[in-house]
Amino acid sequence: MTHDLTLQSRASVTHDTHHLRFERPKDLMCKPGQAVDLTLMRDGWRDQARPFTPVNGSEGDTLDFIIKSYPDHEGVTAQIATLQPGEKVQVSDPWGAIHDAGPGTFIAGGAGITPFIAILRARLAREGTLAGSTLIFSNKTEADIILRDEFEAMEGLETIWLVTDETNPGPNVQSERIDRHFLRNHAKAENAPFYICGPDAMVDDIEEMLISFGIAKSDIIREDFS
């Protein structure tokens, strides 16, 4: 089943990331962490569905997305940056394997942060704390960190910011990759479950490393496109 959404507003979150707010159809219910396939209702783009994750659940009258734009790719995300209020998109029913299985370690790369936004917001609203949870968020540069202030203000959440393309980032940001050396310090059973989202190769590598450190596959939550 598909749903038609009307854009209410578009605002900048970072230099290349946009917050899109749509009117929510009453029959579209989305659990935190689930994705939808989104299609632009523009000529030449109606056969270009792409997966995006709402950053809010089924509460309220809107469906919100935070989407990183890649203008150099000349694809759907480049078009996202030019959407205007009143334009329509079409989305599928929600799908996906990423869900809230309780406090744990959230590992995100770039735009892979979006399912965790919804999960962490919902749990904080429900329980009042994110105690026992750690967010490890890797980006190319410090300017790419999405919603940093919001995450740092979340009660009980430990945040670890990593950048890969800057050698001298600002305070509380590490110039480091998520490799075996880094992950060894976090891959402990008491830090499970491990939630992973990001580029496919990154997710595969991290899952493989976690398993090699003795983490059970059942304690790893990731999207499965197989």
Where are the regions a protein language model picked out?
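FNR/FR-type flavoprotein reductase catalytic core
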Residues: 61, 72-226
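Ferredoxin-reductase
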Residues: 2-85, 139-141, 164-166
